[in-house]
Regions:
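Noncatalytic, solvent-exposed loop/strand surfaces
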Residues: 1-269
Length: 269
């Protein structure tokens, strides 16, 4: 069966591979030759329900791992079964699994926090967890949970990492924290709340500045600073609605969209 909200994952290009989150009972993740479409490998089925997470890449020591997150069964304290999986991107072998963070509808992909650290975030009160992956002498992998924090999460977009701090829009069905900043050790530094409200919109880092759609009509240019929210400019560019799409930048042109239109903005001199 198709997920309720459709197939929303992005495929991942890694070298000559096109990697997709199949999330079936036959294979959790599948890789194809990006030019010919020939099947290269498929992973084992992953524990947990199908979600909306795209596969992402992290580094563990000198190795590259593919990370895939699955959805939990149930919600709240009864949620269980969801997993975070590290996979060899060249063979599809599942290298490690972490199961102490649960989200019934996960969407944001895992974020590489450096030094083998992986940040995992979700909505529906799942909050965030950071783990550290290390290779053991016997060739297996150990997982250390560094922290969990219910006051930092993300409903649709992955957090942005800049100078050892994470920035995310944490407005979900249960709370309206707006734009939130968290340190590398899991301490929330500030949040905008509802003034201004940031509600699941896309963000991108450009030349050390945060460009964010507020999930509604506004586009913001923000200086990412752990001491406080520092907006530099804003403009009403979109029609009102649930404007949660990712932002894209190419050749000095910024692409944003609402429910009716796609806009291309020149942001480079």
């Amino acid at each position: 069966d198709l997920p309720r909200w459709g197939i929303t994952q992005n495929p991942l290009i890694y070298g000559n591979l096109l990697i997709v989150a199949s999330q079936t009972s036959q294979a959790g993740v599948v890789a194809y030759d990006k030019l010919t479409g020939e099947l290269q490998w498929k992973s084992a089925a992953l524990s947990g329900n199908a979600g909306y997470v795209s596969p992402s890449i992290i580094k563990v020591g000198g190795e590259v791992h593919l990370v895939m997150i699955t959805a939990s069964m149930g919600r709240g304290r009864s949620a269980s079964g969801g997993t975070v999986n590290g996979i060899d991107p060249l063979s599809g072998e599942v290298l490690w699994t972490y199961s102490n963070w649960q989200c019934r509808i996960p969407v944001p992909h895992a974020v590489d926090a450096g030094e083998g650290r992986v940040l995992i975030t979700g909505g529906y009160s799942a909050g965030t967890a950071m783990i550290k992956v290390q290779k053991k002498e016997d060739g297996s992998y150990g997982i250390t949970e560094l922290f969990k924090n219910p006051d930092f999460g993300a409903h649709t977009q992955p957090p942005i990492l800049y100078k050892d701090h994470f920035y995310t829009q944490y407005t979900i069905n249960e709370r309206s924290d707006g734009l939130v900043c968290m340190s590398m050790d899991g301490q929330v530094k500030w949040s905008t709340g509802e003034d201004p409200l940031f509600n699941k919109g896309g963000s991108i880092l450009i030349d050390g500045l945060l460009v964010s759609v507020d999930g509604n009509k506004m586009l913001y240019l923000i200086e990412p600073d752990p001491s406080g929210f520092k907006p530099l400019a804003s403009a009403e560019l979109l029609e009102q609605g649930e404007n949660w799409a990712p932002i894209a930048l190419s050749d000095g042109k910024l692409l944003i969209r609402d429910q009716k239109q796609l806009k291309c903005l020149k942001v480079a001199q």
